Curated annotation (Swiss-Prot):
Belongs to the uridine kinase family. It comes from Staphylococcus carnosus (strain TM300). Its main location: cytoplasm. Gene3D superfamilies: P-loop containing nucleotide triphosphate hydrolases. This is Uridine kinase. One of its GO terms (biological process) is UMP salvage. CDD domains: UMPK.
Length: 208
């Protein structure tokens, strides 16, 4: 089997990571690509009451089961299919359903803490940080969490001010220094995305 290229895409909540990822996916047509969201790996909280789950800080590195993510990536790189967990954002715990992933030429890992864990970083061939102004990030998060995750506007704003913003400044922003490339303005920066895609395609060709 050909070697697998692993790409990490990090950045604050609402920074445009998904837009950058989609642009890269579009530019890598012709290659087999798997997209794994770090959000799949929020820790199982079924042992906690619902009230206790509501107190969970989802913007802290400890909220993620990085050990499982790392193991899944190692298995995929070794040609072993994996079952990736999913998360129930309404009930705040891991879902019973899993997603089957097959080994691919390229694996993209996308999440706010994709570059925070050293062991995880060491598996990556390319590390990307998406950098976007805070005011735009909060607007995007507000729209996403109210529409897709069943949250009220008030709860999203309160969480941003009390948790998301301080956690971003403490844990996410510093991971920028680990990036091979920093993409300003999210998915709208076509030049940076094209440069990154060229680098990724070169890596893929060298590993085949």
């Amino acid at each position: 089997m050909n070697a697998t290229t692993i790409i990490g895409i990090a950045g604050g909540s609402g920074s445009g990571k998904t837009s950058v990822t989609n642009e890269i996916l579009h530019n890598l047509e012709g290659h087999s690509v798997a997209l794994i969201a770090q959000d799949y790996y929020y820790k199982d909280q079924s042992h906690l009451t619902f009230e206790e789950r509501l107190k969970t800080n989802y913007d802290h590195p400890f909220a993620f089961d990085n050990d499982l993510l790392i193991q899944n990536l190692m298995d995929l790189r070794n040609g072993i299919p994996v079952e990736v967990p999913t998360y129930d954002y309404v009930n705040h715990t891991r879902s019973a359903e899993t997603i089957a992933f097959q080994p691919k030429d390229v694996i993209i890992v996308e999440g706010i803490f994709a570059l925070e864990n050293k062991t995880l970083r060491d598996l990556m061939d390319v590390k990307i940080y998406v950098d976007t102004d805070a005011d735009l990030r909060i607007l995007r998060r507000l729209m996403r969490d109210t529409k897709e995750r069943g949250r009220s506007m008030e709860s999203v704003i309160e969480q941003y001010l009390n948790v998301v913003r301080p956690m971003h400044n403490q844990f996410i922003e510093p991971t920028k220094r680990y990036a091979d490339i920093i993409i300003p303005e999210g998915g709208s920066n076509k030049v940076a995305i094209d440069i990154m895609t060229t680098k990724i395609q070169s890596l893929i060709n060298n590993q085949q």
